[in-house]
């Protein structure tokens, strides 16, 4: 059979029946049920690490309403024959996802939650017609289905539905909740900008999950997924036999994401072993517990691209699946001295940091340690060493893909913190031909922003372009002019003036003067000013950079 890629597949049965490649993670079923005493299990992983597909697989395996023998045929779990006889398709399963329960107001989010509960009720509509079900429960069930239930009944809804399922099937219910923390994550974000509904949303979820998880005689066990663990005191109050597994824990560490061996098998099946090193450079590097893993979303997207174009280049598939709010928070907090740490990370170094996986959303921004913890839990950073344990660990950027997010996002965010008065001072000096003042101001700006890539020339070019943008000028970067490409061209049409800048990176501080001269000579020799007709004043500058120092020279 030809190799088929499933990108973003979350329906396990469809994935298997369509013949698309599946990285076998079914052994988690046995380990979870037979090798733990957990009544409630929480797995926290970054977005796009296969949590939803995992939960859908569990639903297909356990659900009493399915016959799943065909779709599990040949998978690892079938080696445990006694386990499969005891558990496969033997339990009612209540599976709900909160992935889309997010809005800008409590009312909007609550409405979405009602809709998700209504969808679940429609999936189980047959329960409403069962005479074995308590009449009062049927009444609430109908109100849930038509989104007219009282808030108190919404908070009790999961337990009510589970009680109805138990009445019909005579078996305890397996509860699966995917992306449990999305509603409160969004609520916390909106509360931070003056729309406070975090406490209201938390109260609803605490009631909804608390009644389902605490002292519920109809619960066989529950599995929950999310990005962050919310402290037990905050939402899992009173839950017995509760265990959570984050990116710091060794147990279950290889079940989310692709291991190196799994990627090797995958590339062999795809006949693309030639891309192993490139995929490793771009998408590997995450350390979960004691396992090194790749991001499955990225690997499958890239393999899909390679099927369409044999020489497709790897790119950033992850950046549009996760917002950068936590990075913005870091940069805006002037009381956090993080610029130096970001520079170390972006230059492929490591930082030592105290981290915790036991957080509450309303206190995420209360300390620098918490924010580094969030970057770790959400996949922006990873442990530097799989053998490290404890709360103090070395952190690094996992791979080239995430490094590109830092370069695109963090550097720009720090640039945005440069106030307009500093930009204006720089422009005044340049328009006035004040080389000394321009050198000083540009050097000062360099000290305020992030440097990376060992101060490559591209870094300085991007720095200048970023500073000039937003000042009301037309900014052209590396556009063809004359016989070559000037680094920066500014046009001030209102005042009929223009500026050409050529930037050089100096290898030594004592080379800066001659590098400035070389930059000015390049402007002249390559006729960068040709074509700038109608401007009454054209300034031409060579700027040499050495680390965080700038030297400016004007063409006389």
Task: Identify what each model region corresponds to.
Residues 1-456, 471-472:
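Phosphate-binding site recognition
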């Amino acid at each position: 059979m030809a190799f088929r890629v499933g990108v973003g597949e979350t329906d396990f049965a469809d994935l298997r029946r369509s013949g698309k490649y599946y990285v076998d993670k079914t052994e988690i079923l046995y380990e979870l049920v037979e090798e733990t005493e957990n009544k409630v299990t929480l797995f926290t992983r970054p977005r796009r690490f296969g949590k939803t597909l995992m939960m859908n697989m569990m639903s297909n395996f356990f659900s009493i309403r399915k016959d799943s023998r065909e779709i599990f045929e040949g998978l690892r779990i079938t080696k445990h024959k006694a386990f499969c006889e005891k558990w496969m398709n033997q339990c009612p399963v209540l599976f709900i996802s909160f992935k889309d329960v997010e809005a800008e107001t409590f009312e909007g989010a609550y409405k979405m939650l009602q809709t998700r509960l209504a969808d679940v009720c429609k999936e189980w509509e047959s329960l409403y017609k069962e005479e074995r079900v308590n009449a009062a429960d049927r009444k609430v069930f109908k109100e849930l289905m038509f989104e007219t239930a009282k808030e108190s009944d919404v908070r009790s809804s999961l337990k009510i539905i589970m009680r109805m399922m138990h009445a019909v099937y005579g078996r305890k219910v397996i509860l699966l909740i995917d992306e449990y923390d999305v509603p409160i994550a969004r609520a916390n974000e909106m509360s931070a900008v003056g729309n406070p509904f975090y406490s209201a949303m938390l109260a609803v979820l605490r009631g909804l999950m608390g009644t389902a998880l605490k002292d519920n005689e109809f619960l066989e066990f529950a599995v929950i997924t999310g990005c962050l663990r919310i402290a037990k005191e905050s939402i899992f109050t009173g839950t017995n036999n509760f265990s959570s597994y984050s990116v710091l824990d060794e147990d279950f560490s290889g079940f989310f994401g692709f291991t190196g061996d799994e990627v090797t098998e995958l590339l062999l099946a795809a006949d693309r072993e030639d891309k192993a090193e490139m995929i490793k450079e771009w998408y590997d590097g995450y350390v979960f517990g004691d396992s090194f893993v790749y991001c499955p979303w990225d690997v499958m997207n890239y393999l899909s691209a390679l099927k369409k174009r044999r020489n497709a280049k790897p790119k950033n598939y992850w950046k549009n699946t996760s917002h950068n709010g936590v990075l913005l928070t870091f940069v805006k907090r002037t009381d956090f001295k993080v610029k130096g740490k970001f520079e170390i990370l972006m230059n492929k170094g490591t930082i030592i940091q105290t981290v915790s996986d036991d957080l509450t959303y309303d206190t995420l921004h209360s300390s620098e340690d918490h924010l580094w913890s969030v970057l770790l839990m959400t996949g922006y950073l990873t442990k530097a060493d799989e053998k490290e344990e404890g709360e103090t660990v070395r952190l690094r950027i996992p791979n080239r893909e995430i490094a590109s997010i830092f370069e695109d996002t963090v550097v720009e965010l720090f640039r945005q913190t440069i106030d307009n008065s500093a930009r204006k001072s720089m422009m005044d000096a340049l328009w006035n031909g004040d080389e000394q003042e321009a050198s000083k101001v540009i050097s000062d700006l360099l000290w305020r922003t992030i440097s990376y890539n060992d101060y490559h020339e591209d870094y300085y070019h991007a720095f200048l372009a970023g500073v000039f943008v937003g000042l009301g000028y037309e900014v052209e970067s590396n556009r063809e002019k004359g016989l070559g490409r000037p680094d920066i061209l500014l046009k001030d049409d209102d005042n009929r003036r223009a500026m050409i800048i050529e930037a050089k990176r100096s290898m030594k501080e004592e080379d800066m003067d001659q590098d400035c001269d070389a930059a000015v000579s390049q402007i002249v020799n390559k006729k960068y000013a040709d074509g700038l007709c109608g401007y009454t004043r054209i300034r031409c500058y060579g700027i040499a950079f050495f680390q965080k120092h700038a030297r400016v020279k004007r063409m006389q």
